[in-house]
């Protein structure tokens, strides 16, 4: 039986996105265990995602999508990550790029006419959105040069997860005009553009199958009408309050799923022999760290439920992001000890989780800026330039 026959690909016959993720995850897990080349992008998994209903899951039903909430999307990604971290992390980038305009369509009706075409394309054409957030963040990156009718873009976007499968890169570039502060322009660029090239750069410790290659943009012209937003470079903007509040709970749900699977593998290995008191204590510590990661991710999702993105929700989300990473990494490190020497074998699958969880360290806000942001909030100081 083929993979397509193993799952029911008709979303209408599914109860939840978690049901779909659970069945797909079993397939993805088998593929990850059997992979001969971990550096290879998980293209076959994305093909299944594309026909499963998960690509359009976050689009409002009025626009043809599944109408999944951020909580449901987070649970979906957590479930996928339990089986294959690379697939889940790469897909989280598409997922948050859908969830953000979906939230705005629901809560910012004035923006709906601008957002609807993109959301309808995701629902109808099942296009994959890429995020260049790892390159751009608050400061922006790349150069936008004013030309007749638009802007010529020159940029190299690193950490573009899912690049081999992407249809539209959601990105930006910095426009510098005499006598004015640098401005970041936001826009989408079709990956089919002759001015766009995916560079084969992704050779990493973990999350090897995400295809997070550099994307080179040389001379693509974005029409003036295709720039829906612009902001000052190097300053937090209300748009980024929305982006960061929604995106990071989704991304860190992936790392929670990785940690949960590492825990279960370790317990399974430990049970194969008579555990001593030391192993029992390590297992208890591991479960406490995992509980900490779960609480941290839940706090992040609680910030989304407020439906009021602001500096305060950024603070809550980024505190959660830091705690989620810290506790998830600690849980997986303890899983290696609980498993003992058996966990050192690649066949166990634990060492892949150990490598994958390390990527939790590198997303914004990293520890220094995050602590500074939280401290400034506590002291009533400005935070608009802390990132």
Predicted regions and their residues:
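Basic/polar N-terminal segments that are highly enriched at the extreme N-terminus
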Residues: 1-19, 23, 387
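Glycine-rich phosphate/cofactor-binding loops in nucleotide/flavin-utilizing enzymes
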Residues: 342-387
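Glycine-rich flavin
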Residues: 43-51, 56-165
């Amino acid at each position: 039986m083929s993979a397509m026959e193993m799952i029911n690909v008709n979303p209408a016959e599914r109860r939840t996105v978690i049901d779909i993720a659970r069945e797909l995850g079993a397939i993805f897990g088998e593929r990850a265990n059997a992979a001969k080349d971990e550096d290879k992008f998980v293209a076959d998994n994305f093909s299944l995602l594309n026909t499963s209903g998960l690509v359009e899951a976050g689009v409002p039903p009025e626009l043809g999508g599944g109408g999944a909430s951020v909580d449901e999307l987070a649970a979906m990604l957590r479930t996928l990550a339990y089986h294959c971290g690379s697939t889940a992390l790469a897909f989280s980038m598409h997922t948050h790029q859908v969830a953000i305009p979906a939230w705005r369509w629901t809560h910012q009706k004035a923006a709906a006419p601008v957002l609807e075409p993109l959301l309808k394309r995701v629902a109808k054409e099942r296009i994959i959105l890429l995020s260049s957030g790892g390159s751009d963040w608050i400061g922006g990156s790349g150069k936008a040069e004013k030309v007749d009718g638009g802007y010529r873009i020159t940029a190299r976007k690193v950490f573009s997860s899912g690049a081999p499968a992407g249809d539209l890169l959601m990105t930006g570039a910095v426009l510098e005009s005499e006598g004015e502060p640098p401005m970041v322009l936001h826009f989408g660029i079709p990956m089919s553009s002759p001015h766009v090239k995916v560079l084969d750069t992704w050779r990493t410790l973990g999350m090897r199958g995400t295809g997070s290659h550099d994307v080179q943009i040389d001379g693509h012209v974005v029409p003036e009408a295709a720039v829906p937003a612009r902001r000052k470079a190097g300053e937090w903007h209300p748009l980024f309050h929305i982006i960061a509040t929604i995106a990071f709970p989704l991304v860190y749900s992936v790392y929670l799923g990785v940690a949960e699977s590492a825990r279960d593998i370790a317990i399974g290995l430990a049970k194969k022999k008579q555990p001593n008191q030391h192993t029992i204590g390590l297992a208890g510590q591991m479960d406490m760290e995992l509980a900490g990661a779960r609480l941290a991710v839940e706090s992040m999702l609680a910030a989304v439920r407020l439906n009021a993105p602001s500096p305060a929700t950024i603070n809550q989300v980024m505190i959660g992001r830091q705690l989620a990473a810290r506790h998830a990494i600690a849980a997986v490190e303890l899983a290696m000890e609980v498993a003992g020497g058996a966990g050192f074998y690649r066949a166990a699958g634990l060492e892949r989780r150990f490598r994958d969880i390390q990527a939790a360290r590198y997303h914004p806000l990293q520890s220094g800026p995050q602590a500074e942001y939280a401290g400034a909030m506590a002291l009533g100081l400005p935070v608009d330039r802390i990132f």
